[in-house]
Amino acid sequence: METRFGASPPYTVGVEEEFQLIDPRTRALTPKIEEVLAAGDGELPEGTLASELSASCLEVRTPAYASVAELARALPALRARVRRLAERSGARLVSAGAHPFSPAAEQPITGKPRYRKVDEEMGWPARMQAIYGLHVHVAVPGGEEAVRAVSALARHVPLFIALSANSPFWEGRDTRLASVRAKVFGLIPRSGLPPRFASWEEFVRHVERLVRAGSIRDYTFCWWDVRPHPKLGTVELRAPDAQTDPGRTAALAALCQCLAAAAEEFEPEDPLLTEENKWRATRHGLEAELYDFSGQRTVAARRAAEELVGRLLPVARELGCEAELEGVLEISRSATGADRQRAVLAREGSLKSVVDYLAEATA
């Protein structure tokens, strides 16, 4: 398997943010991806903008940065440029895990052969994927380091979901979940928590078996919550909902970077209990009670976030992301994105008002 591990300095970081494209009049999703991509041609560095499965989704990719502080400074300006491109194309930009009311099955699939094939092979689950995530990439030196980082991140996927929860509504209904995206994404094959790999070679053998079986064409068809990405030389965290506030994006990126760098400090944990924690975080967000492996106790998600940040602060100082990691504390002490969306609905009485709030807050 071709890899680029070690091609970049270790623990450089970049993100991919998936944005909703919104009709300014109806506030519904609008399939304007081709118009936005055309508007961005020559305006932004090649590869910055990309399509995804849904034609109402715009993926925005940052370059790799030496520090999360650099990423944090770049994100607002990049979002502003992309927002202007969307507006020129007749769309508004929204960052949240799911649209409050647009029916998922009505969203057209993009014309990319990859996604046409996915639609053909999966059927209904593919049509439900009108969801929007934050992906964090952290460069690692080699395959073994990638496997260890995946393991360390996997045990903390529930906490990432709790911190990022930003999708309470689905097709006009309050799901009573903090992250409906986490459940909808689980409809597709090879999603959810990653298998536990003892070595890089075991990961390679697993992918090769799936290729020989005709299940996948390459490892990028394994859509786990966190995975090695050898073509980029990174580990990729895929669990968080898209964040309305770019400051929260930076905070989650810092947490991911620190965990990847400190991976050897975290032993693999019982996947069944991690799955249970993931459900609790999906349902309750930061109000969840999570099983704490180290203390064999139940701990509030907010407290778990504070304890993890405290443990990682020495690593953050070495990486230069202490301020951004402390942003996780700010998230843990405030309302989630899901809470804020519900508050807007309670105050305004309209899901269109929720869309307006999200569009205005997507800074």
Curated annotation (Swiss-Prot):
Transmembrane segments: none annotated. Keywords: ATP-binding, Ligase, Nucleotide-binding. Its EC number is 6.3.2.2. Pfam families: GCS2. Gene3D superfamilies: 3.30.590.20. One of its GO terms (biological process) is modified amino acid biosynthetic process. It comes from the Bacteria. GO terms for molecular function: ATP binding; glutamate-cysteine ligase activity. It is an enzyme of class 6 (ligase). It catalyses: L-cysteine + L-glutamate + ATP = gamma-L-glutamyl-L-cysteine + ADP + phosphate + H(+). The keyword Nucleotide-binding applies. ATP-dependent carboxylate-amine ligase which exhibits weak glutamate--cysteine ligase activity. NCBIfam families: gshA_cyan_rel, PRK13517.1-3. PANTHER family: GLUTAMATE--CYSTEINE LIGASE 2-RELATED (PTHR36510:SF1). HAMAP family: Glu_cys_ligase_2. Belongs to the glutamate--cysteine ligase type 2 family. YbdK subfamily. This is Putative glutamate--cysteine ligase 2-3. It comes from Rubrobacter xylanophilus (strain DSM 9941 / JCM 11954 / NBRC 16129 / PRD-1).
